[in-house]
Amino acid sequence: MSWQPELDELRRRQAMTREMGGADKVKRQHDGGRLTVRERIERLVDKDSFREIGSIAGKAEYDSKNDLLHLTPANAVMGRAKIDGRHVAVTGDDFTVRGGSADATIKEKDLFIERYANQFRVPLIRLIEGSGGGGSVKTIETTGRANVPGVRGWEMVVNNMGTIPTVGLGLGSVAGLGAARLAATHYSVMVKEISAMFVAGPPVVNRLSPRQFDKQDLGGWEIQLRAGAIDEATDTEDEAFACARRFLSYLPSSVYDVPARGPVTDDPDRREESLFDAIPRDIRKVYRIRPIIEKVVDQGSFFEMGKLYGRSVVTGLARVDGWPIAVMASDPMFYGGGWTADACQKVERFVDTAQTFHLPVVYFCDCPGFLIGLEAEKSGVIRQGVRAMSAMFQTTVPWCSFIIRNAFGVAGAAHQNGGRLNWRYAWPSGRWGSLPLEGGIEAAYRADLDAAPDRKAKMEEIEERLNKLRSPFRSAETFWIEEIIDPRDTRRILCEFVDVAAPVRGVGPSTHWMRP
């Protein structure tokens, strides 16, 4: 006797769950400009690589003879797959089934995929829409009680932050636990126009606020990108999937591996003549840092993260001679490159990511210090600043720093882990000290200036005298700066750095686990 009847029943049940919330709900999803969860997974991963786990989990309806009438799937689809040939775990919310809320959730599925990714040491991608399995008021009626708030399994979400790359894609409105799951990642993306993210959505907020909000007003992509709650926003879902794939391409599968070298596609000895005069002599003039980064890393490899948040610091991943690196750079277009409170938060999180996944850090420093003034003090910039510095000083990954213009004050000192040996270079445009002369002279020579018959002339005299003494060559004479280089040699030095750094990258968990 064969087992064909049981296999037929299995196929029948799988066919029911693949209908998701039904034709009407699927049409509504498409009419809203959004893909279904199964379409999303198909477009995200390598062709034919997805293997679903829990394919017939859901809520079953039986007749009086205990024969199955209908099977409504759980509102999460999950499984294993491959991206660029590498094993990953994927979970996606099915918004066509009760909007992704708790009363259609089988919590064990969420717990399983988090544990699966952790124990098999593979990256995890969450496709999030709705409340992500979070609570609904209807749950009170269906369970007959009100639950004391708790997030079962959150300890595994925390553990995964220190163990495997996690990516979150917000592909519709996400609220409550869904928003938390999106934020608790190393890299997160929203899709413009169709995505929104909030602790509580407009129906809740509008009951309590005199101002009435729609989804985009309250938690649209631009709000969340500027707040640092997400890392990127794209025009389409397919672009979001491409961002996820590209982000993962720079990282190992887990902390128990090192980032793999990619194809060598660029000449390590390439010299960019435009770097020779990239930094203006006039310190009042600014310049654009991104073209400088793009000229020294492998062509087309720079992948920026968090562009609209903490804008005085640029962060991203790149390749140098095929090796993945983490790149930080000051952006003088915003606050002259000074560290604001949000820039410090951005640096802390980025450095922690590099440390967690064994990425060498390259920093192009042009930092005049922390932002000063009343608003800066009210933002708590000094506490955020020392948190960023602490993250840097806790790193064990190799560092290579280039002081391309300013390095002043406490924030300027945070251009490397001062407790470890690092590669450090200065361009001829480098200038450093406790304070920039432009502000420091007034404080240090106030008595001389007050006593001078011509205050302006005295100021110019002191400034001219000190300018000669602060030459980078004076610092190099005493080995305060290890080497001054021709800016056009920067790429060659970087290629040598990553080659030397590659064998000393360790594996395993960081000494301190990363937090979102």
Label for each model-derived stretch:
Residues 1-516:
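Ligand-binding clefts of soluble mixed alpha/beta catalytic domains
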